Amino acid sequence: MGTTSSQSKTLYQKLYDAHIVHEAPNETPLLYIDRHLVHEVTSPQAFDGLRAMGRPVRQPGKTFATMDHNVSTQTKDINASGEMARIQMQELIKNCAEFGVSLYDLNHPFQGIVHVIGPEQGMTLPGMTIVCGDSHTATHGAFGSLAFGIGTSEVEHVLATQTLKQGRAKTMRIEVNGTVGAGITAKDIVLAIIGKTGSAGGTGHVVEFCGSAIEALSMEGRMTLCNMAIEMGAKAGLVAPDDTTFAYLKGRQFAPTGEQWEQGVAYWRTLKSDADAQFDTIVTLDAADIAPQVTWGTNPGQVIAVNQIIPAPESFSDPVERASAEKALAYMDLRPGIKLTEVAIDKVFIGSCTNSRIEDLRAAAAIAQGRKVAKGVQAIVVPGSGPVKAQAEAEGLDKIFIAAGFEWRLPGCSMCLAMNNDRLEPGERCASTSNRNFEGRQGRGGRTHLVSPAMAAAAAVSGHFADVRELSAATH
């Protein structure tokens, strides 16, 4: 699959081949893992497995842990999110101390969402293999690293051996050419891509995003893009590293320095697909065609531009898609033929490993400034990490949000998933900057619409979905 001549390779193939430890006929190749990120939910059983067998963590210096999934965003009290959360966090503290793993706990200034702190601290570097017991590990692919989520038994295997059995994936190139219009962000680009491919369009593939619109994105934007590669069914997402990547990484805590930095950059510049490399699948989009996106259904592929009408199930020729649309509209309590700008919301969530970085908060604050959250709407802003929160506060973004009636919270995964106190009640409708709109994802019976941070802020101040391009053009 994805075979090319021995000379020409895709970026994915270069990364994969560079990490093969052992390969034999009829066996899944064994890959070396450069970085293992750990959080409180998928690690307790893995550490218990090591303990039962009397095994150490093989490379504690390449293993980093944080608390994020079930932490409270209102207090740093470990007891605040309930008994199960408390046990998981206490187990993580105990396990990291026992096995010598660095832990960014609730009181650490760098604590935050695992996929925010990895890049922020320079743990994530181009050319690496990176795993975490979390499906959105694909985020780190923005740096030209092969990053993917693993299950708890695989977490144990990596802790014990620093390796993982991993078959070769197919390759897909997604090219977004041209320039996006005003107000269009990486979130809109990736939702438009998933709208085109469908939520299973990337199944079995590792996706490389390229084209002038991708090259123009900041690292934050590229992380948003790769974060949601998983939402089109892909194993991982990649963007080739370039000067934007190197400028972001330089001087970060775990980034190399001096001569090692120069050597690193020289190697990282080779991490790109060869000009004649063959991809199994190629998808192209014109950036100029992309409008602000809003999901209407219960998977990220059920998405439309904010100025389009909600589709009727009978407009889908595929019977599976038609049935899925019918079920989604019933769950979401929406009618075909209307625009989402006519649909009122109850809650707004700005945060998650998709959109909780400084650039995201700036975009939301620009819309919130001088406006007020609509009556009856609860809007929360959850920075992705301690450093993001500190930077936002240094720039006065917290004051803008609070003045507009948003709640300014502590870092964590928050309302992205119903594993802490931030969740939807049955029937509540939320404009969310997170990555999944499945049934019950944000709370049993909750209705999730995925949007960009600016679109979420626009919905908060309007009380319904709104076209951010009209709002930002209007005078406050």
From Swiss-Prot:
One of its GO terms (biological process) is L-leucine biosynthetic process. Its cofactor is [4Fe-4S] cluster. [4Fe-4S] cluster binds at residues 353, 413, 416. Binds 1 [4Fe-4S] cluster per subunit. One of its GO terms (molecular function) is 3-isopropylmalate dehydratase activity. Keywords: 4Fe-4S, Amino-acid biosynthesis, Branched-chain amino acid biosynthesis, Iron, Iron-sulfur, Leucine biosynthesis, Lyase, Metal-binding. Its EC number is 4.2.1.33. Gene3D superfamilies: Aconitase, domain 3. Pfam families: Aconitase (PF00330). Heterodimer of LeuC and LeuD. This is 3-isopropylmalate dehydratase large subunit. The gene is leuC.
